[in-house]
Design a protein with these regions (language model features):
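Non-catalytic architectural context of zinc metalloproteases
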Residues: 1-84
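Post-HExxH zinc-binding segment in Zn-dependent metallohydrolases
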Residues: 1-21, 27, 169-200
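Active-site scaffold of zinc-dependent metalloenzymes
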Residues: 37, 120-152
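Auxiliary, metal-adjacent structural segments of Zn-dependent hydrolase domains
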Residues: 71-132
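Second-shell loop/turn segments in exported
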Residues: 76-84, 143-148, 193-197
Length: 200
């Protein structure tokens, strides 16, 4: 799986938010829905099946389920520390600000394995509900190494990540200008996890 995933980075640019796109589309058995049109376009459709097969094998071989459950106290502590921020988020603001009446469902994923990476993917489910996500990394810790979520740092990032679901669009209409701009600033943007023109 690891070698295959690395090859997808090199051949198709499957990295950053493309990985999160796969994660939110998978069900609890690591299956994709029959129609996975919301999967990031960097996922080559010919590679999705082999990736899922290898992922399931990895989950089984690594005894991931046992690992996950052995760390439940850690996850619960992270959730407890995040709750003040969770309680301060006003999801109605997005509808008011963007002028949309919608049945969006908001989800926060605390991903302590992401380090400082944060993402804002979305998926529309079979009931036509738009599920918007803020996948929050963990990079600030206390004196014993436990994650902390300083509101003044984390809340603006959380809001930013949810915004992606309301403003992302098909970038192809801006390909020419996007490629020109990225040629000039690509090196600096890549250091900020924007590895190609279409995600800037």
């Amino acid at each position: 799986l690891i070698s295959f995933a690395r090859s997808l980075v090199k051949t198709d640019g499957v990295s950053y938010d493309a990985v999160m796109s796969m994660a939110i589309n998978l069900d609890n058995q690591f299956n994709l829905p029959a129609d996975y049109g919301s999967l990031d376009s960097r996922w080559n459709r010919n590679q999705v099946g082999p990736f899922i097969k290898l992922l399931k094998k990895f989950v089984k071989d690594s005894r991931f389920d046992a690992f996950y459950h052995s760390n439940e106290n850690l996850y619960q502590e992270a959730v407890s520390r995040f709750m003040p921020i969770y309680k301060s988020i006003d999801t109605q603001w997005y509808n008011d600000f963007y002028g949309q009446k919608s049945n969006d469902r908001f989800h926060i994923i605390l991903s302590m394995s992401n380090g400082p990476g944060n993402y804002g993917p979305s998926v529309t489910d079979k009931e036509n509900v738009h599920n918007v996500f803020s996948v929050m990394g963990a990079w600030v810790t206390d004196s014993v190494g436990m994650v902390v979520y300083p509101p003044e740092l984390i809340l603006p990032i959380l809001i930013h990540e949810f915004n992606h679901s309301f403003i992302n669009f098909d970038p192809e209409m801006f390909r020419t200008s996007g490629e020109q701009i990225y040629a000039a600033v690509g090196e600096q943007m890549a250091r900020q996890a924007y590895g190609q023109w279409s995600i800037v």
